Amino acid sequence: MLMHSVRCWQYASAFAVIDGLRPDREALYVACLLHDIALGAEQNPVAGCFAVIGAGRAEEFVRRHEGDDRTAQIVHETVARHMDVETPMGSEAALLHDAAHLDVSGRRIRDLDPHCVDVIESSYTREGFAADFASRMKIESRRRPQSTAATLWRSGMYPAMKANPLERRVISSK
């Protein structure tokens, strides 16, 4: 999952250039690294989605490491919104959302220069990612069946993951 998070950072940075956005780079980096920290986490009676649970943990991380309120709030919002069906408002939230959706299902791959994709994919291995992520999503959908993640899973996330052009690149390189 760490390589997924790092790829998200790389893809988010590329999308920032393409989309003409100027995110808070530190907040975006932290959000990218921590966005799946609660995927499959224990039950939480208050939060109905791992993204919201993870947002709280990521915000706490920023505060514990002397981050300012603004950064903590951006990280929280960015992590909380990364599973939204539509791209959320706000530079950081939009960039992580689109990067995570690209890495998982290939969404927006045509927006990127193929060389950029080659560099990222050759630098940060995705071997085993689809199986690991699918396993975690199954757990997540059982723990929080009303969550956005569970709804996306039931709506065909796994076939979209298997059809991801990035995932097919791994298979063809073996």
Regions found by a protein language model. Give the residues of each.
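Short amphipathic alpha-helical interaction patches enriched in hydrophobic/aromatic residues
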Residues: 16, 38-41, 62, 66, ...
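Divalent metal-dependent phosphate-bond-processing catalytic cores, especially two-metal-ion Mg2+/Mn2+ enzymes
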Residues: 1-21, 67, 84-174
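A broadly conserved amphipathic alpha-helix scaffold signal in soluble, globular proteins
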Residues: 56-63, 77-80, 100
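An active-site-proximal "capping" alpha-helix that borders the catalytic cofactor pocket
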Residues: 8, 49-64
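His-Asp-centered metal-binding catalytic motifs of divalent-metal-dependent phosphohydrolases/nucleases
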Residues: 26-44, 54, 75-83
